[in-house]
């Protein structure tokens, strides 16, 4: 697996660009904003975006989801349906927290615990992890020993992913 971590927005939330080395297909996980910058990284990596994966509906994790999906013509997968409240509030969250361009979206696929998502030939198990938000999900791969956890776990702090 190839991976790029891209801190975005004033929150410095980590958006992940996950690339399958076998197919060169990619997904953004939690594109919170700074969409032009995200596409620059994608272009530099020479990968083809196939989808957007979303862990939860807070502005710093999904403020750029609608724009990324529209610009690339790719589907949105996740989060869990219990996040619809937060996603419906994205326009307001963007105004409150100064994230321009943030707007609501409708996932092409809502996710549930036990579902599977793919990026190229790579497979990730979806785990529903309510707590930070009701519909928070994570994407875990035992094959690669990695999990994209959104705001379920923090390394060395209580708020910087």
Model-based region annotation:
Residues 3-5, 29, 52, 76, ...:
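Generic preference for hydrophobic
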Residues 1-45, 138-150, 155:
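Conserved beta-strand hairpin/beta-sheet module of binuclear metal-dependent hydrolase folds
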Residues 18, 30, 56, 68, ...:
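Divalent metal-coordination and catalytic microenvironments
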Residues 23-26, 34-122:
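Active-site HxH/HxHxD metal-binding segment of metal-dependent hydrolases
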Residues 92-93, 116, 122-161:
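Metallo-beta-lactamase
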């Amino acid at each position: 697996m190839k991976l790029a971590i891209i801190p975005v927005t004033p929150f410095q939330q980590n958006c992940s660009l996950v690339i399958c080395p076998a197919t060169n297909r990619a997904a953004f996980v939690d594109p919170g904003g700074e969409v032009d910058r995200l596409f620059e990284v994608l272009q530099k990596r020479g990968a083809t975006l196939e989808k957007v994966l979303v862990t939860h509906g807070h502005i710093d994790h999904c403020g750029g989801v609608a724009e990324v999906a529209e610009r690339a013509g790719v589907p949105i997968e996740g989060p869990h349906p219990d996040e619809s409240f937060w996603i419906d509030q994205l326009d307001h969250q963007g105004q409150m927290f100064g994230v321009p361009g943030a707007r609501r979206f409708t996932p092409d696929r809502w996710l549930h615990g036990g579902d599977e998502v793919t990026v190229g030939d790579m497979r990730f198990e979806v785990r529903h992890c309510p707590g930070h938000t009701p519909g928070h999900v994570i994407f875990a791969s035992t094959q690669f020993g990695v999990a994209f956890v959104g705001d379920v776990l923090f390394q060395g702090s209580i708020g910087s992913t």
